[in-house]
Amino acid sequence: ELLDNEGFIEEALYDEESNIAKRFMPNVNYFSRYIGSNGNRYQPQKLLNNSTILLLGLGGGVSNILTLLAGLGPKKIIIIDYDNVEEGNLGRQLLYTEEDIGKPKAEAAAHAIAKINSNIIIEPYNKKIIRPEDVLEHVSGVDLVICAIDEPPFIAQRIVNKAIVTAKVPCVFGASQVSRGRVFTVIPGVTGCFDCMNLHYSMRDPQFNEQFIAFRNIEFSPPTIAYAPAIYQLTAAIVDEAVRVITRYAEPRSLGTQYEINFEDGSSFTHPTWPRYADECPTCGNGDIDKWEIFKYYEDKK
């Protein structure tokens, strides 16, 4: 029992009905380390193979998320992005080739993934997310959303947050901040949402609103700062978090908190958690948006 509790004993019976493709057996063997002797080591992979994932955004190094998902084998991936492939993308968005320059990212990505795993249903959409309805149009039947939209900062995340709360679909959010990356996960009705995080920080930090205004008013557009090995650390964490939410092979690390990765030294930690404000939040609860100053600044920026 002690060895089993410590994960040294695995369920090793061969399941002839598992119907797991050989390409996924290394995944199964990995998951079995966490399942233990009483579980079904095939179950996490089966859940992945039957899942539908909506990926929002292919900028930065996010196309690498799509590559990792292809190796995990979800049944269907819906991808949405409005940009075209540029030469400057090729140093970190390694799904694309020189032949893709000038093509819509969503279409080029779908073509590339079809070559990696032809069994995945890929639905590409060349569109920009500017309101929650743009997400809700595609969320029916989706098991998990991954939000990697980086523009406009914070506003894009709030738009997606409204949509996933309305649809009651979990979402893993990820963003890069030059030398660091952050991941946080929202499960509607279970964790606090993105607006709960805004409420939490504005209630506890007297300077939060002021700092947000200062950031919002910056007119300078910095050059793209993205280094592929660093971005891979972030995208791997995002995808693993998505797998944890879908399969529960292990507990997700970013539920109601920000999981931060330091690209320079490889360390990681979780920020203090924020709760779900069911009575105060105007998005996932019963709160009045007009009572909270922070949301006024979001509206002013639109």
Residue ranges and their predicted role:
Residues 1-53, 299-302:
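N-terminal charged helix/coil linker that caps or initiates catalytic domains
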Residues 1-18, 137-144, 149-302:
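Glycine-rich phosphate/adenylate-binding loop
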Residues 41-86, 239:
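Glycine-rich adenosine-cofactor-binding loop
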Residues 50, 102, 127, 254-258:
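A glycine-biased structural micro-motif
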Residues 67, 71, 111, 198, ...:
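Short, well-ordered alpha-helices that flank and scaffold nucleotide-derived cofactor binding pockets
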Residues 75, 119-121, 170:
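Residue-level detector of anion-binding/catalytic polar loops
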Residues 76-117:
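Glycine-rich phosphate-binding loop and adjoining beta1-alpha1-beta2 segment
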Residues 106-144, 148-153, 157:
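A structured beta-alpha segment of the ubiquitous adenosine-cofactor-binding alpha/beta core
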